[in-house]
Design a protein with these regions (language model features):
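Extended, hydrophilic extramembrane loops/domains of integral membrane proteins
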Residues: 156-182
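Juxtamembrane/start-of-transmembrane alpha-helix segments at the extracytoplasmic/lumenal side
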Residues: 184-195
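An acidic- and aromatic-residue-enriched active-site/binding cleft used to recognize and process polar
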Residues: 21, 177, 186
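Charged, low-complexity helical/coil segments in non-catalytic cytosolic or luminal regions
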Residues: 1-164
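Flexible loop/turn segments at secondary-structure boundaries
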Residues: 23-25, 168-169, 180, 189-190
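Juxtamembrane boundary at the C-terminal end of a transmembrane helix
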Residues: 204-210
Length: 210
């Protein structure tokens, strides 16, 4: 089965910036080699408690406030080139659907904080390994204070389509900036996949020509 017609859509995103200050505790792990009785070497890790303050600026944390497109492959075709955004111009949207957000600014910020928390956890673990010159970091617990919080409401270009294979409908999306494809495909549906790649190629060609 071939894909249905592609629909050009401008989808809404919230982006958030914030300065973060996190007080943390954790454990720094130091590896050492110990020779066993049979002559082989074994790695053992010694742990010591650590604590500190980590500061980091979070830039352009994106939240897609569109419930309608959450299963269409849009998340899988991220990221978008946010540095290429231009000021709002109705002429650019002419001929395309521009979807309105369904998740408000406040709820979007709550979602963004979940993303920020995961990024901070990884950053703090890296900070511990660098600052204490250890091999591992574990048991990180932290609390974060946010300041200088700003946001933007943006629209990003996406091509949406779907195809039917063995009585099941599969949706997918194409990033209108990069041509990256997102979505799930059935196993062994080679003709369908080739058709998708053909249409993606056409879109990419149009993008580069314009």
């Amino acid at each position: 089965s071939s894909p249905k017609a592609f629909n050009g859509v401008y989808l809404p995103y919230w982006t958030y910036d914030a300065q973060t200050t996190s007080n943390f505790t954790g454990n720094a792990g130091y590896d050492r080699k110990v020779r066993k009785r049979d002559g082989t070497l074994e790695t053992r890790t010694t742990w010591r408690p650590v604590s500190g303050v980590h500061q980091e600026f979070m830039d352009d944390i994106t939240v897609m406030p569109s419930n309608r497109q959450e299963n269409s492959g849009v998340k899988l075709c991220e990221p978008f080139k946010l540095s290429k955004l231009i000021p709002y111009d109705p002429k650019v949207l002419a001929g395309f659907v521009a979807e309105r957000y369904s998740i408000g600014l406040k709820d979007g910020w709550a979602i963004a904080q979940t993303t920020i928390h995961e990024k901070l956890k990884s950053s703090i673990e890296d900070y511990i390994k660098f600052h204490w010159k250890c091999n591992h970091a574990s048991g990180v617990v932290f609390s974060t204070v946010y300041s200088k919080i700003t946001y933007k409401y943006i629209l990003v270009p996406v091509w949406i389509s779907s195809f039917k294979y063995k009585e099941k409908t599969y949706q997918f999306a194409v990033n209108g900036q990069t041509g990256k494809v997102g979505g799930k495909a059935p196993v062994s549906a080679w003709r369908v996949l080739l058709a998708i790649l053909f249409f993606v190629g056409v879109i990419a060609a149009l993008y580069y020509l314009t």
